[in-house]
């Protein structure tokens, strides 16, 4: 249920929100997420956002800036850096590849 909540609320979910919603302590929740996903809460949210961004880049004509905002990044340069680090290419390069 926690993982589904993160998937559905990836844009603005915080560890504080999750802890409050599921009546769990933040340390316990952090450990649980790490055990279930293999990554930290922050890394998990980033992975979900990047996956959603990839899908949008392939299936829409939205600008990279709008996609960044849609998946929860206010700064497009930050989004571009994270995307390039994750996929070894910029969002534009990803969109243009065949």
How should each PLM-predicted stretch be described?
Residues 3-8, 35-74, 96-98:
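Terminal helix-turn-helix DNA-binding modules in bacterial transcription factors
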Residues 1-17:
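General nucleic-acid-binding
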Residues 12, 16-48, 68-90:
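Basic/polar phosphate-binding segments, predominantly the helix-turn-helix DNA-binding elements
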């Amino acid at each position: 249920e926690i993982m589904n909540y993160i998937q559905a609320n990836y844009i603005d979910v915080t560890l504080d929100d999750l802890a409050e919603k599921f009546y769990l302590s933040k340390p316990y929740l952090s450990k649980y997420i790490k055990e279930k996903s293999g990554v930290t809460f922050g890394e998990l949210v980033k992975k979900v956002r990047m996956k959603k961004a990839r899908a949008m880049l392939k299936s829409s004509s939205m600008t990279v800036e709008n996609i960044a905002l849609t998946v929860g990044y206010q700064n497009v340069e930050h989004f571009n850096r994270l995307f390039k680090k994750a996929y070894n290419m910029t969002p534009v390069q990803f969109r243009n590849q065949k």
